[in-house]
UniProtKB/Swiss-Prot annotation:
A zinc finger (C4-type) spans 38-59. It comes from Streptococcus pyogenes serotype M5 (strain Manfredo). Zn(2+) binds at residues 38, 41, 56, 59. Its EC number is 2.1.3.15. This is Acetyl-coenzyme A carboxylase carboxyl transferase subunit beta. It is an enzyme of class 2 (transferase). Pathway: Lipid metabolism; malonyl-CoA biosynthesis; malonyl-CoA from acetyl-CoA: step 1/1. Binds 1 zinc ion per subunit. The keyword Nucleotide-binding applies. Keywords: ATP-binding, Cytoplasm, Fatty acid biosynthesis, Fatty acid metabolism, Lipid biosynthesis, Lipid metabolism, Metal-binding, Nucleotide-binding, Transferase, Zinc, Zinc-finger. GO terms for biological process: fatty acid biosynthetic process; malonyl-CoA biosynthetic process. Belongs to the AccD/PCCB family. The keyword Methyltransferase does not apply. Disulfide bonds: none annotated.
């Protein structure tokens, strides 16, 4: 038997079962749906204070909104006619888990795909409209997204309509491989045909607009608007910094930075977009 015992390195604490079971029993739970945290100023906001436009009352940050919410804010009530709802992804590569991911996105958003397309009236001006929804697999551009937008431009040519697109995307949809990348050229060709017909094309960049969407139809509008502080770019910030071996400005890839460097024509508050769209469409010949 040893005469000496090695000194304990740590203090031993016996659990106090009384304290363990007595904490927070009478503290009321606050439902998550009552409050939202602003990503910009970090303030907790009572959701009713965000309003229909979902703008932070403290710093004016524009929260990301769904395609249906965008539709309500933009078009004349009851005027929207949805188009191309029968087109569905066939999972050409049989990518593992892709069908399950699509189904979950459909159930969560109520959309068939990452873009809502159709015809609508904005203050009496008829337009062909597309709204991308970042809640649907980050609004990544796959074959169906590309096909729906292409058909929208073709319809606009036939009916002599201006096209308005709200862009939001994480880029090409990796689950569809090279076929998703082909949509960049496909949609761009449709944009060109629409332009050759002398028709007006307006893009509104929303947070986030990145990857192949930025590299194609998002930046091909006759006029390019953007919501305040929207993230707009192609590659990610860290990828660019690693490639060029330079530190980029803090506001790099923000809408304001792009406007200062000539890539965006104007930054428009979300609450003013409806009036701005109607004015620009009417000025460029209208959609009667």
């Amino acid at each position: 038997m040893a005469l000496f015992r090695k000194k304990d390195k740590y203090i031993r604490i016996t659990p106090n079962n009384f304290l363990k079971g007595s904490v927070s029993h009478n503290v009321p739970e606050v439902p998550d749906e009552l409050f939202a945290k602003c990503p910009a100023c970090k303030h907790m906001i009572y959701k009713k204070d965000l309003g229909l436009a979902k703008i932070c009352p403290t710093c004016s940050y524009n929260f990301r909104i769904s395609a249906q919410e965008r539709l309500t804010l933009t078009v004349d009530e009851g005027s929207f006619q949805e188009l191309f709802t029968s087109i569905e992804t066939k999972d050409p590569l049989r990518f593992p888990g892709y069908q399950e991911k699509l189904q979950k996105a459909k159930e969560t958003t109520g959309l068939h795909e990452a873009v809502l397309t159709g015809k609508a009236m904005v203050k009496g001006q008829q337009i062909a409209l597309a709204i991308m929804d970042s809640h649907f697999i980050m609004a990544s551009m796959g074959t169906v997204v590309g096909e729906k937008i292409t058909r929208l431009f073709e319809l606009a040519i036939e009916e002599n309509l201006p096209v308005v697109i709200f862009t939001a995307s994480g880029g090409a949809r990796m689950q569809e491989g090279i076929m998703s990348l082909m949509q960049m050229a496909k949609v761009s060709a449709a944009v060109k045909r629409h332009s050759n017909a002398g028709l007006f094309y307006l893009t509104i960049l929303t947070d986030p607009t990145t990857g192949g969407v930025t590299a194609s139809f998002a930046m091909e509008g006759d006029i390019i608007l953007a919501e305040p502080q929207s993230l707009v770019g192609f590659a990610g910030r860290r990828v660019i910094e690693t490639t060029v071996r330079e530190n980029l400005p803090d506001d790099f890839q923000k809408a304001e930075f792009l406007q200062d460097h000539g890539f965006v024509d104007a930054i428009v508050k979300r609450t003013e977009l409806r009036d701005k769209i109607a004015h620009l469409v009417a000025f460029h010949g209208g959609g009667q």
